[in-house]
Structure formats: structure tokens, C-alpha cells
A protein has these predicted regions:
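Active-site-adjacent structural elements in enzyme catalytic domains
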Residues: 32-54, 113-129, 139
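Paired acidic/hydrophobic, glycine-rich loop segments that form the ligand-binding mouth/hinge
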Residues: 133-134, 201
Length: 467
């Protein structure tokens, strides 16, 4: 009888212990993480252009197969009046994604008018014990990554040497007087990133980390070393990185080279009018630019791909980590190439984004409490137009205004892409809503199919229980 009671007691204790271990394992297995992937300037036109080129008109991209798809309305306000502004830049839109607040163009995680610092999801996640990382194909001091971990009144205050009377491309771009350390501010973007609690930063922008504005002042790269970052300047150096190291990877002086370019580095061109057509629009001829091929960019060969950087980031952030992580990955030059009217460049960078999405979804498949969101900050200039006008039978030359690029596709067709938002050397952003894609968690957690852009922050913060 005593033996039976002892057996029952032992069995009960064993079951309780097993239940406790199971609960612990379940808790460990349910570690929440968020991977936010941003295609800068990626809208439905850019996605369709890339799909037509990469997969064919009947093909699909990985984005098309994600369980959730919705749209976000972009919000911007005027710096002085606070009235709505209907076309954004990357600074205020990244601020919306990073902080859930609406601000004016050019601001990095600071409020319009009052210039208050706005807490970012990176800072909130750090405060809750999550590891955090930023990966980009631009300079890591550029507007999108900066908005997740820095606070300045102007996106152009990227280094200690660029805080007062900033001039870029021959244009005066203002100052960040109140952000100067001498005035009690946090310093430039590069200094703030160097002193941040981020676990990982990968991208370009080396020049902003070695610049200073006075003899004896520490550079941002010195501050980063003092803050425990292992600094690498070449992808070959990753073999020296321990999985638990804090990493600052600076793989270019400014932005990383793009994957594809037009042959002979061609961009969109202006249709050529005959002399007679210049005299009278109803007569003569207008000749469209000759079609181009997209080719591999030789400058890209030694550059880490966005896929490689994304894999490394996830490895570093997840290593021996039961607390989860927040990772922002940006394909930056969809936008930059569109500004330059270079569709092949934008196509290649959207292809890079898709590769990064593949890496994120693969990780989420093995770690099912990982939320993966893919979105854009704003829309852009490129649009698909008829290669042969619908009105070509009219007895006059009919052609697209602005500049046009005609790209040979793998199907043997010609994809005509128009840029006509500006008479300046660079194209403008546009003001439509942006797409947002998600994995199954976006569905199960009931992310709305229509939302305001700041709501993306709220959804991520709620999922990570940061509020």
C-alpha cells in the first residue's frame, strides 16, 4: 500500500514537472519578433514593372503569394501650419512607420513645429529587452534607417561635419543648430547611431562615420567602437564576426551600388521632335528612344546583397536570444533609381527586396511567432505607358510627355516606362497610398486591409507588447 502511494506521488510530481518543462519550452518557442521590410518608393507601378520584367506578364512574385495584402494612406503635415501635405518624403514617412506620429518632410523622428523627439519602435523594443537591427542598401544615415534610431530636425544632418549651413548638390539645406551637442542636443545622425543600443547596423555611409567638425572631437566610428560595436568595412570580414557580436557594417562611402543598370548606363530619354514638329505639333515626326536591355552592374560584384545582409542580421539578432528582436530591412534604391529615371536599377533593387522577403519568410516558417511585414514609405514617378499610343491612328504625332525608357523584356516585348513629374534633373515622389504585405500573423492578428501609415507602427508595437 505504501509502495502504491509512493508511486502515485512520484507520478504526480513527474507530470507536474513535465507540464512545467512543457510550459517553459512553449514560452521559449513563442518568442515574438518583427521583421519590417521597406521598399523605398515601391508602389504598384514599381511592383508591376518588376513583375513584367522578372516573371513575365503572366508570372507572379513572392509578394503576390503572401497571405495578407492591404494599403496604407500616407500622411504628411506642413511644418508651420500643420495643414495636410499630400506628397511625402522618406524622412516623414519613415518617422510615421517608426514612431506612429505624423510629421513634416525632412524630419527624423521629431515633431513638426515644436521639434520634440518622438520615441521609436527601436528604442521601445530595446527598453523591453528585444534586440534590434537596421539593414539598408543606402547609407545607414539616410532618412529611412535614421528615423528608427535618431532624432534630428533635418535628414541632412548626417555627420558632425554636416550640422550647420549644410550644402548638398550645390543647394543650401539649412542647419540643425538645436541638435548640436554643444547646444545640449544629441548630435548628428551618425553619432546617435554609434551611441545607440542597436545590436546591428549594416549598409553604406562610411564617410559620415569618419567625419568630424573640430580637432580632437571623436568621430562617429570612434564612438561606435567605444560602444562595443565590431566594425567591418568589407563583406569578407564577416568570417571574423562572432554570432553574439554587436556589428556596424559600412560597405560603401555612401550608398551601395545597384544590382542592375541600363546598357551604357542609359536612363529614360526625351522623345526627339523633327524640325517640322517643333514648328507645329500637328506635323512632322516624333521619334521615341531606342529600346534598351537591363544588364548586370559590374560595380555591384563585391557588394553584399540585401539577401546576404538580411541573413546575417537575423543570425546575429536571433543567436541565443529568447527575448525576440525587431529588424528593419530597406531596399533603398528603388527610390533613388526612380529619381534618376533608371528603371533597370529600380527593377534590380525590387528583386533584391524580394530576396530579402524570402529570407524573412524562411526564418518565420521555422519561428512561427515572427511577424513579417513588407511595405513602402511613399509612391514614385515611374508609370507604365503604351509603347504604341492608343491614339496613334490620329493624323498627328502622339507620344508621352516627359522622358521615356523602353525596356526589352524576357518575353520579347517592350515595356515603356514614363517619368514626367518634374522638369528638374530628378523626378518627384507622388501621393498615392502604399502597398503593405504580411505573413499569416498579419491575418490572424487582424491587420486592417486599409489603414493610415502610422497604424503600421501601432500594429507592430501591439504585437511586441510595447505599449
Amino acid at each position: 500500500m505504501a509502495i502504491h502511494k509512493h508511486f502515485v506521488l512520484t507520478l504526480k510530481l513527474t507530470l507536474i514537472l513535465a507540464s512545467f518543462i512543457s510550459a517553459i519550452n512553449s514560452l521559449a518557442d513563442s518568442t515574438k519578433s518583427v521583421i519590417l521590410i521597406i521598399g523605398d518608393g515601391m508602389d504598384d507601378h514599381q511592383i508591376t514593372i518588376a513583375r513584367n520584367y522578372l516573371a513575365g506578364s503572366r508570372g507572379t512574385l513572392l509578394l503576390d503569394k503572401m497571405p495578407f495584402r492591404g494599403v496604407a494612406q500616407v500622411l504628411t503635415i506642413d511644418e508651420v501650419s500643420g495643414l495636410p501635405v499630400y506628397v511625402a518624403d522618406s524622412a516623414n514617412t519613415a518617422t510615421a512607420l517608426a514612431t506612429g506620429q505624423v510629421t513634416s518632410r525632412g524630419r527624423i523622428a521629431t515633431s513638426a513645429g515644436k521639434d520634440l523627439d518622438l520615441p521609436t519602435i527601436v528604442e521601445l523594443a530595446n527598453g523591453k529587452g528585444y534586440r534590434t537591427g537596421l539593414v539598408t542598401t543606402s547609407s545607414i544615415t539616410d532618412a529611412t534607417p535614421a528615423s528608427f534610431a535618431a532624432h534630428v530636425s533635418s535628414r541632412y544632418c548626417e555627420s558632425p561635419a554636416a550640422m550647420v549651413n549644410i550644402v548638398k548638390y550645390g543647394i543650401e539645406l539649412g542647419s540643425c543648430i538645436d541638435d548640436l551637442k554643444a547646444n545640449g542636443g544629441l548630435g548628428s545622425i551618425s553619432e546617435q547611431l554609434a551611441k545607440s543600443n542597436l545590436h546591428l547596423l549594416l549598409g553604406g555611409g562610411r564617410q559620415y562615420f569618419i567625419a568630424n567638425n573640430s580637432v580632437g572631437q571623436s568621430t562617429a566610428i570612434q564612438l561606435a567602437a567605444e560602444n562595443g560595436f565590431t566594425i567591418i568595412n568589407s563583406w569578407k570580414e564577416i568570417d571574423n564576426i562572432h554570432p553574439n557580436d554587436k556589428v556596424l557594417g559600412l560597405f560603401a562611402e555612401e550608398h551601395l551600388p545597384v544590382k542592375l543598370k541600363g546598357e551604357a548606363d542609359r536612363a529614360a530619354e526625351t522623345p526627339k521632335k523633327s524640325i517640322l514638329n517643333r514648328i507645329n505639333n500637328y506635323f512632322g515626326e516624333v521619334t521615341l528612344p531606342s529600346p534598351m536591355n537591363c544588364i548586370a552592374n559590374s560595380d555591384f560584384m563585391d557588394t553584399p546583397t540585401l539577401k546576404e545582409m538580411s541573413k546575417m542580421a537575423i543570425k546575429q539578432l536571433s543567436y541565443e536570444n529568447r527575448d525576440g528582436f525587431f529588424l528593419m530591412i530597406e531596399s533603398a534604391s528603388i527610390d533613388k533609381q526612380s529619381h534618376e529615371r533608371k528603371p533597370c536599377g529600380s527593377i534590380g533593387e525590387l528583386d533584391q527586396l524580394i530576396d530579402a522577403v524570402s529570407v524573412a519568410l524562411e526564418y518565420a516558417k521555422e519561428n512561427p511567432d515572427t511577424l513579417v511585414l513588407v511595405t513602402s514609405d511613399h509612391t514614385h514617378a515611374a508609370q507604365i505607358v503604351p509603347d504604341k499610343s492608343l491614339f496613334s491612328e490620329y493624323p498627328m504625332p502622339v507620344y508621352t510627355p516627359g522622358k521615356i525608357a523602353r525596356v526589352f523584356t524576357k518575353e520579347g516585348g517592350i515595356l515603356a516606362i514614363n517619368y514626367a513629374t518634374s522638369n528638374f534633373e530628378a523626378e518627384e515622389h507622388t501621393g498615392a497610398n502604399v502597398p503593405i504585405f504580411g505573413n499569416q500573423i498579419a491575418v490572424s492578428e487582424k491587420l486592417p486591409t486599409y489603414m493610415l501609415q502610422p497604424d503600421v507602427f501601432s500594429f507592430m508595437a501591439r504585437y511586441l507588447e510595447l505599449n
